[in-house]
């Protein structure tokens, strides 16, 4: 059964990416591209591993240990839940007695007994309802507390030492970590608290009413109920086990579908602009068909001849022309149909087509979930609804099937029936729990995988760079001679890699060799010294590894040979091409990565900073927004309200405010005018900020004293820039060929 289930899941992946071809088959590459499954085989392997077994239970225990890491509040809630369950179970006993008294008073006509039973019943049922509400309240608080504990635990690990970046950049074992931290944890804790509630009250009901059934009926009563529901449990177990894998896949598909729409929201303007040109091309495709050269009736060769032979020749030519005319019309009709079909297909945006394919895969698997859930619900409900018949069968045994046959009093029938029904209801809770466990198992797998991968990445020394602060006694420090990149197709042995910290006077790279996260070597043996006050410009083709070198210097990416000596993190500041703006006020944008709790900026300084770069109108706009109460500070999203140039200027003001000794700017002025760009470098020079820039503009040369140039052949060139009246740039080039170690001088720019 499990094997067929995995095959069905594989069919879901394949069918969702199948084309309209007659064979109906698709390659693995099509599956990966259309569903964005970069690791389809790996995912199927994970699905096969996620089954309801002992390994899953051990994963669950590890999560429970986290939930009870601070045990006082969880244990207190557990005891309150247990006490409320005991009270509700005890009160329910009187409900059966009251029903017996009411039934007896009606058959005997005892009005006083009837009224007193009703009054007592109000108290009993009211108390039972009150404790039921208390139990639900405790369950909600328990879920809230567990979510708080688990989410904060995972977030603490996820954000520690930029672990989130390592996972997203270097590891593909976790899909949609945002979904796992947000919705998966919420759903898991809600389900778990509900299951715990049923597992606490269920045993109490079973134990208590087992005793009552034994004392009021005989030993066979609880034995029959036990056997009946153990049979139901094993049948449900067979149906439930395959659902773990299906639910795991469903959670992944839901996350991928949500992520796709999140990307559409983030890039809505770009998508709309790209598709404007697409509409024009569609219009051209319709007009091109109308320009086809073909014959019609007006182009027939008409000429009147009296001669019979000439008339016959005319008739033959007319037939040929008509035949060509007919073929042309058929051809034009076919082209029109094909064009209309293409236009119809092109009406869908690429994003819409992707969303459609993702949604079809989601719906296909959801249909399987529904069918399997139907089977589980059927078996569960069957055992629940048949329990009254089992109850009456048990009561009938002493009446019809034992040697000492004796009729039962009506009051006895009521009490015995109620006790059997309550015992059956206790077991029914376990049957109902099995439905929740199938959903819970998927969340256990996803959350535990998140925790396991975070811990493994934290312990993976191949992604770490040892950073030490040098002093006069200790100028160097060696690392092990063999370090291997994990999770790569190829292993890369490293001889020496090290980042040492100085007092902020220079950044030095000594024989640094670095690779992409996929293991492709970019450049080797880069040696360069950037002293304070000497700006460095890095130029080269797109994708040549310019930004990668910035990541290496920052310590985000590992490098595998050489050493780096640089200032401490507090003396360095990084500006990406796409600025990062948080939800908050403009003051919070400038303070980032600090918060208002740590620092504040006076309004006069804020105004001066923004005026310096001609965007002080943003402060007035923010004041208007606050005054009109359109949005609160916490959720204010400036990213959607500012142009790319304004966003880059905000990031530059952030840099100017923090005044680091070194700034690493990755095309951070690409969206602002050259006049403002000149002002940026001028202000940075006034404040003593040494800049390492990545860029393509020739205008950047005059703000730097050294050029590090990359080419497409993985060679690097270190060049001195000589500015003459800021009009021209003469560059004395030192050409270092990594293959021949040949040193030559030439000129790059005229």
UniProtKB/Swiss-Prot annotation:
UniProt biased composition (Low complexity): 15-26
Residue ranges of every copy of the ABC transporter domain listed in the record: 507-737
Transmembrane segments: 63-83, 123-143, 188-208, 215-235, 382-402
Statement: the UniProt record of this protein carries the keyword DNA-binding: no
Molecular function (Gene Ontology), one example: ATP hydrolysis activity
Bias (Polar residues) ranges: 1-14
Entry coiled-coil feature ranges: 334-370
Binding annotation for ATP: 540-547
Compartments it resides in: Membrane
Membrane topology of this protein: Multi-pass membrane protein
Disordered, as annotated region: 1-32
Protein name (Swiss-Prot/TrEMBL): ABC transporter D family member 3
Natural source organism: Dictyostelium discoideum
Lineage: Eukaryota, Amoebozoa, Evosea, Eumycetozoa, Dictyostelia
The gene coding this protein: abcD3
